[in-house]
Amino acid sequence: MFLLPLPAAARVAVRQLSVRRFWGPGPDAANMTKGLVLGIYSKEKEDDAPQFTSAGENFDKLVSGKLREILNISGPPLKAGKTRTFYGLHEDFSSVVVVGLGKKGAGVDDQENWHEGKENIRAAVAAGCRQIQDLEIPSVEVDPCGDAQAAAEGAVLGLYEYDELKQKKKVVVSAKLHGSGDQEAWQRGVLFASGQNLARHLMETPANEMTPTRFAEVIEKNLKSASSKTDVHIRPKSWIEEQEMGSFLSVAKGSEEPPVFLEIHYKGSPDASDPPLVFVGKGITFDSGGISIKASANMDLMRADMGGAATICSTIVSAAKLDLPINLVGLAPLCENMPSGKANKPGDVVRAKNGKTIQVDNTDAEGRLILADALCYAHTFNPKVIINAATLTGAMDIALGSGATGVFTNSSWLWNKLFEASIETGDRVWRMPLFEHYTKQIVDCQLADVNNIGKYRSAGACTAAAFLKEFVTHPKWAHLDIAGVMTNKDEVPYLRKGMAGRPTRTLIEFLLRFSQDSA
């Protein structure tokens, strides 16, 4: 048996223990079909011994205390999110990964605005499951670590990687709960994480594959398989024209790919007449910037400029799987923003569905143009709430980075509900201003009722939100600018590098709580 990492001083002890058959000769000699992830807490006092979780204690007893013995000689106590792997301790598990959970009993951190204990579990379990995946073991049992939902989220989110177009793929690892714990909470965590992974998949897929039409087809397939209480309408260009969505059409006309207006319904309420919550998502499947073309550096990331549509549609798919007793509508205007002889030109004036005219001074501020018409249409459902999500502005990335989604809302009630949900999920939100100060900058327009960019360079996220507000009359509306959380580099430890699918879990949690409050 050998252990990584292992201090030189411990190698002698390991060999001595090995002679006494405290564990087997190595992973090759064991059954390489299943691994185990177990948690351990940090020491509360300097003289204390680190404490295993209940599952960890039970396993240690099962192997006659060998796990703690080899853990003690293998190095210093594990810090939060760190792992240590052992082999051959038990015939059922070829590898056992012990993961650091941080402080036992950690709760809500009012400065961080999240539940520290849940975040520690997600990060630790993700790290442990990846160790199992790196060993090419196809199955892992996961310690619930005191919160089976958070553990499931860590496992499912942490194992996901988009490698569908590669010849060499990572081993697919099946994660399940270790022991007879809270299976309901585990399955709920799997569902939450799978919803976020669906959004990650949609955002990561190259734009030549994930066209507006293909996006709509993927959502239709997922929603229909989630519940029989669903309807999907894939609206063609002719329907968009009938709806007089001139602002949306002005963006779409620059591309050879036909636009689609995706409309999805989940009818979970026992009262069919119960007004729905309406979600609207920006669906630019590739954003070149149009005539106001972007710099080539990192333009490939603009395959994910439909992140708003991806998150709201994935949220509704997840709500359908949860069988929530509420009615939902999802609206996603889908198109590409491309330069061509037919494309919008700076200085053009277009007319939105509500009759307002828009001066298009920057064709790279196109997301707000397609959202304007979708928000107007959202009001026709007499909704309880309207929430839109969009990778709308680089200014939001500058303001908050990947720390939180920026929320602009005209309702403190709605803000509080979103904020409370985000504390639970760890996918944070932060309230931004909707001052009249910003509205003045976009309605002071030479040629039209409103300009698609502000008068000044400053506060671009705020002027974009002020623009959207011109197409909203509902008293409970929130605009989520998710540009800063679109990708993950290394900021969220339980997400691999790539498209993040945020804040899907926060929106699912918001709906779960809303349905419980309405019951």
UniProtKB/Swiss-Prot annotation:
Textual note on the cofactor: Binds two metal ions per subunit. Two metal binding sites with different affinities are located in the enzyme active site and can be occupied in vitro by different metals: site 1 is occupied by Zn(2+), Mn(2+), Mg(2+) or Co(2+), while the tight binding site 2 can be occupied by only Zn(2+) or Co(2+). One Zn(2+) ion is tightly bound to site 2 and essential for enzyme activity in vivo, while site 1 can be occupied by different metals to give different enzymatic activities. Mn(2+) is required for Cys-Gly hydrolysis activity.
GO biological process, one term: proteolysis
GO cellular component: cytoplasm
Protein's name in the database: Cytosol aminopeptidase
Top EC group: hydrolase
Keywords assigned by UniProt, alphabetized: Acetylation, Aminopeptidase, Cytoplasm, Hydrolase, Magnesium, Manganese, Metal-binding, Phosphoprotein, Protease, Zinc
CDD domains for this protein: Peptidase_M17 (cd00433)
Keyword DNA damage: no
Organism: Sus scrofa (Pig)
Positions contributing to Zn(2+) 2 binding: 282, 287, 305, 366
Protein residues bound to substrate: 282, 287, 292, 294, 305, 364
Function: Cytosolic metallopeptidase that catalyzes the removal of unsubstituted N-terminal hydrophobic amino acids from various peptides. The presence of Zn(2+) ions is essential for the peptidase activity, and the association with other cofactors can modulate the substrate spectificity of the enzyme. For instance, in the presence of Mn(2+), it displays a specific Cys-Gly hydrolyzing activity of Cys-Gly-S-conjugates. Involved in the metabolism of glutathione and in the degradation of glutathione S-conjugates, which may play a role in the control of the cell redox status.
N6-succinyllysine carried by residues: 45, 61, 103, 221, 455, 476, 489
Cofactor dependency: Zn(2+); Mn(2+)
A Pfam entry, by short name: Peptidase_M17
Name of the coding gene: LAP3
